[in-house]
Design a protein with these regions (language model features):
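N-terminal entry segment of cytoskeletal motor ATPase domains
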Residues: 1-112, 117-120, 128
């Protein structure tokens, strides 16, 4: 792999929001998701209220309870300059919950999966 190719892969891996990709195409999206997947970064934002999760078919430390508590703490902290956590299903669930609490409007989280096991696993993470 040459230096330019390595830089492209590193740049795609660093993209946390698919809406921020330059030259948006199917190939760019798949390449970005692939690079993130290969580094065990399985969650990627799509704008401010959507998330893509690629099932790694293995344990990923980012789904641990300790990580869940970090995301919950992100919303309890009142620091205006706090760094935002990387995209995660815990973050999406927190956003929906706290938006519901602030606005008293119902919220929905839609799940789509080709695998029932993946669907159930993400559902369990959301329910935590």
């Amino acid at each position: 792999m040459n230096r330019q190719s390595t830089l492209v892969h590193q740049r795609l891996e660093a993209v946390e929001d698919l809406a921020q990709l330059q030259g948006l195409s199917d190939e760019t999206i798949v390449s970005c998701l692939r690079e993130r997947f290969l580094s065990d970064t399985i969650y990627t934002r799509v704008g401010s209220s959507a998330l893509v999760a690629v099932n790694p078919n293995k344990y990923v430390p980012s789904n641990a309870d300790s990580v869940m508590h970090k995301y919950a703490g992100e919303y309890r902290a009142a620091q205006p300059d706090k760094a935002q956590q990387p995209p995660h299903i815990f973050q999406l669930a927190n956003n929906a919950y706290y938006h519901m609490r602030r606005t008293t409007q119902d919220q929905s989280i839609l799940l789509a999966s080709v695998s029932l096991l993946s669907f159930v696993y993400i559902y369990i993470l959301i329910r935590k």
